[in-house]
Structures are given as structure tokens and as C-alpha cells.
Amino acid sequence: MDNNKIGKFITSRRKEKGLTQQELGDRLFVTDKAVSKWERGLSLPDITLLEKLAIQLDVDVSEILCGEQGKKEKI
């Protein structure tokens, strides 16, 4: 997994959905700082958040882990 690629993907999908980091964080019950760290590739979302994040971004968990839409990584 490439943290930077995943972060860019999260950023792209969040912006496509018209959400701020604060709004996405509020929906996931995390801080905007946590979302910022994911997007900058400094950390990854906790495994317990992946499904909720995927729902908010309207993608599959595997697409988040690949950092690309339409790509499926075997989990």
C-alpha cells in the first residue's frame, strides 16, 4: 500500500463529494486533523473506519486500499 497514493485518492473523492475535511471527520467521528494526516499520507484510517469511509466516499474499501477507483486489491 502506498500511503501517499491512498491519501490523494481520499482527497480527490472527498472534494468530488463537496466535503471539507471537517465535514468528513464529523461524519466519521474523527478530527479534521486525522483526515488531514490521511490525505497527506502521514497515517492511514484505522481499520474500523474503512467501511464507513468507503460509504462516505461512495467507493469500495478495496479501492481506498489501492488508491484508485475501479481497482480492486485482494484483501
Predicted feature locations:
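DNA major-groove recognition helix of helix-turn-helix/homeodomain DNA-binding modules
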Residues: 48-63
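Short alpha-helical DNA-recognition segment
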Residues: 18-37, 52
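Short, charged recognition helix plus adjacent turn
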Residues: 65-75
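Short, conserved catalytic or interaction motifs in soluble domains
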Residues: 40
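Short coil turns linking two alpha-helices in DNA-binding domains
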Residues: 2, 20, 31-34, 46, ...
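A short, Lys/Arg-rich alpha-helix, primarily the initiator
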Residues: 1-16
